[in-house]
Each structure stands twice: as structure tokens, then as C-alpha cells.
Curated annotation (Swiss-Prot):
A single Gene Ontology CC term: cytosolic large ribosomal subunit
PANTHER family: 54S RIBOSOMAL PROTEIN BL35M, LARGE RIBOSOMAL SUBUNIT PROTEIN BL35M
HAMAP family referenced in this protein's UniProt entry, alphabetically: Ribosomal_bL35
Name of the protein this chain belongs to: Large ribosomal subunit protein bL35
Family: Belongs to the bacterial ribosomal protein bL35 family.
Family annotation (NCBIfam families): rpmI_bact
Region of interest: Disordered: 1-64
KW Coiled coil (keyword) present: no
Record organism: Pseudomonas aeruginosa (strain ATCC 15692 / DSM 22644 / CIP 104116 / JCM 14847 / LMG 12228 / 1C / PRS 101 / PAO1)
Length: 64
């Protein structure tokens, strides 16, 4: 049987770390003029994936 392929879209969006799965924030690509500076600042950087979504993303990344 051939190897299972990783979902390439998931591979681009999530990174496996020792603490869990890391991801970037959504809603930060365009039409940012309506958004407050505080909100744009809060959406910077990365955060850890919610526990309820981990199983689904791990299946997409073929970690499970």
C-alpha cells in the first residue's frame, strides 16, 4: 500500500511543535482600514490551535 499523502493546504497553515499545533490568525489579509489598530495588533503573530480542532488537523497532516 502506498504512503498516505499530507494535505498540502494543511501543511502550509499549521506547524507541529512540542506544545501542540501552531497557526496564524485569520482576518488579517486585506480591507484592514475598517479594523481598529488594537484589533490588528491582537491578530499579529501565531497562537496554539484549540484542543477541539487538534484531532481534525492531525488527520489532515497525517500525524494520526
Amino acid at each position: 500500500m502506498p504512503k498516505m499523502k499530507t494535505k498540502s493546504g494543511a501543511a502550509k497553515r499549521f506547524k507541529k511543535t512540542a506544545g501542540g499545533l501552531k497557526h496564524k490568525h485569520a482576518f488579517k489579509s486585506h480591507i484592514l482600514t475598517k479594523m481598529t489598530t488594537k484589533r490588528k495588533r491582537q491578530l499579529r503573530g501565531t497562537s496554539m490551535l484549540n484542543k477541539s480542532d487538534v484531532a481534525r488537523v492531525e488527520r489532515s497532516l497525517r500525524l494520526r
